[in-house]
Amino acid sequence: MKFIGFIAAFLMIGTIILPAQTYKPAERVYVKTSDYVKGHFNGETPKKKATIWVIGDLRDDINEVLNGADSTPVRYRYWRKDNKTLWMLNSVARTMSITAGVVVEDGKIVDITVMTYRESRGHEVQSRHHRVQYVGASITSDNNLTNSIDGISGSTLSVNSMKRMARMALLLHNDATSDD
């Protein structure tokens, strides 16, 4: 009888402790960075990644885009060939970050792809139907996208995160190519 009581106590404690552990959904890696970079630079990877420092007006613009959702990094690394730039950006959706690759050419988005998705829900942002809305978008003088992006029911925070990354990539591209 004592043995049964011991087992019952063990099972009750186990059901209390296990749910208290932090739940972390599995990362969904859709595309590897090296494959994505090669795919947008004709099978080649530019020899050296460039760096852009976030200072002055650029910092103010990025802070406006992030609106407190993420902290503003001091610098961003990117790949560049002629007037095409490729950015790997992270943005928090609900609790976890999304990593997206954004390709910008001549001030317009050519491609946006979810590289790694870490949230437990909202993964629909990686669908082609959603991503195609960003193609051809540029940034307005008040740092908004020129294209209207439709939301996805149940994925509002993930959609907002993707919009932030698209806007950031356009701002960064414009600053990086302004010397030309």
Segments from the language model and where they lie:
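Positively charged n-region of N-terminal signal peptides that target proteins for export
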Residues: M1-F6
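Flexible, solvent-exposed loop/hinge segments and secondary-structure transition points
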Residues: Q21-I149, S155-T156, N160, R164-D180
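Sec/Tat signal peptide C-region and signal peptidase I cleavage site
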Residues: I16-A20
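Bacterial N-terminal signal peptides
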Residues: I7-T15
